[in-house]
Amino acid sequence: RDTDRSRGLGDVYKRQIRGNDISMIFQDPMSYLNPIVTIEKQMTEGIRAHDKCSKQEARERAVELMKMVGIPAPESRLKQYPFEFSGGMRQRIIIAIALACNPKLIVADEPTTALDVTVQAQILDLLRKITEESDAGVIIITHDLGVVASLCCLLYTSPSPRDRSVS
């Protein structure tokens, strides 16, 4: 049985959905971020692809996003590489990239894995703030019941592909 519902959709349409409608926060920022490309290049590339704006406008949007997620001195940090950021700061970069096109839905896959408790709390506060200040919904994929208790108003559990429950 074919379960790929995106089959038949054009690549341009799928790309538009992926950035403008749905965005993703990945579990491991170092796997997502390219270690040999500056943060500026990685952030502005997606902004320019979706918003059709100038390099300067994309750079200004990247600075705005970095401020929004709590990265200090964003103008100077744009020129840095991912390895120059802490784990928590890299996760903030991933969140900023996810917010770049004002998506309607953000899927966060284990967004606090491998972060210490203090940074984890900061990231959860940031996700809470984002959902309160924007029209975006957030789906959190996690095994951490502390994250669930902190953020979720609806819980969907799936211990196996056949057994599912909503509470």
Task: State what each model feature region is.
Residues 115, 119-165:
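P-loop NTP-binding/switch modules centered on Walker-like glycine-rich loops
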Residues 100-104:
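A short, proline-enriched helix->beta-strand linker immediately N-terminal to the Walker B motif
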Residues 80-85, 89:
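Conserved ABC ATPase signature
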